[in-house]
Amino acid sequence: MIIEEQVVLVDQQGRALGLQEKMQAHRDGALHLAFSVLLYRETTQGIEFLMQQRALGKYHSGGLWTNTCCSHPRQGETLEQAGLRRLTEEMGIVGLESLDDIASFVYRAELDNQLIEHEWDHVLIANGTELAIIPNSEEVKSYRWWSKADLELGLADTPELFTAWFPQVLQYVINELSSQ
């Protein structure tokens, strides 16, 4: 039996309205709850961010670079629980105990395959120093740690290599880390 994945629909204030099948929500462009996790580490050269290149077989944005992982919380699941679950499912990361919810924003982007991302996206962060990474090849084509400078240069020179939501996620994380 195939279990339908559902997303939590929200209003413009982020309040839950109900559920909709995930692919239908993306065809309709329905506003729904999502999260983007970005792990960072401090090195002698500065802060680095753990990025993944989405697997080519993903239902959208395959092959593009993005934050460590992203998805949608299930009904009754907190954003932190969902973020930790997807870190394990996508990146094979276990042992991280918590994520900080630092910001949220709404974005709408028309994607490939006639899909529309319209999300109330929460930005979740944690220090990812010394975590073992064993990516799931169905989710992740590649991964690497990027410096802030390399990311800013990549976004300026080749924005088409990154997902639609990533520039906003990165800006919120940079602002948060520079205020600490």
Curated annotation (Swiss-Prot):
The active site is at residues 70, 119. Mn(2+) binds at residues 26, 32, 72, 117, 119. It is found in: Cytoplasm. InterPro entries: Idi_bact (IPR056375), IsopentenylPP_isomerase_typ1 (IPR011876), NUDIX_hydrolase-like_dom_sf (IPR015797), NUDIX_hydrolase_dom (IPR000086). Mg(2+) binds at residues 70, 90. Its EC number is 5.3.3.2. This is Isopentenyl-diphosphate Delta-isomerase. It comes from Photobacterium profundum (strain SS9). It is an enzyme of class 5 (isomerase).
